Amino acid sequence: MKRTFQPSNLKRKRSHGFRARMATKNGRKVIANRRAKGRARLTA
């Protein structure tokens, strides 16, 4: 059986990257929440 996690940096950046987050209102909310919490890393 194939494992479910098949890592790809391109797919990772496209779905969870900074620019992907900033592209939508909800994504910007995610960034804001993570900044407010004081996360060292905001995005993948």
Swiss-Prot record:
Entry keyword Ribosomal protein: yes
Organism in which the protein naturally occurs: Pseudoalteromonas atlantica (strain T6c / ATCC BAA-1087)
Record's keyword annotation contains Nucleotide-binding: no
Name of the protein: Large ribosomal subunit protein bL34
GO cellular component term, pick one: ribonucleoprotein complex
Domain of life: Bacteria
Biological processes annotated in GO: translation
Pfam families xref list: Ribosomal_L34
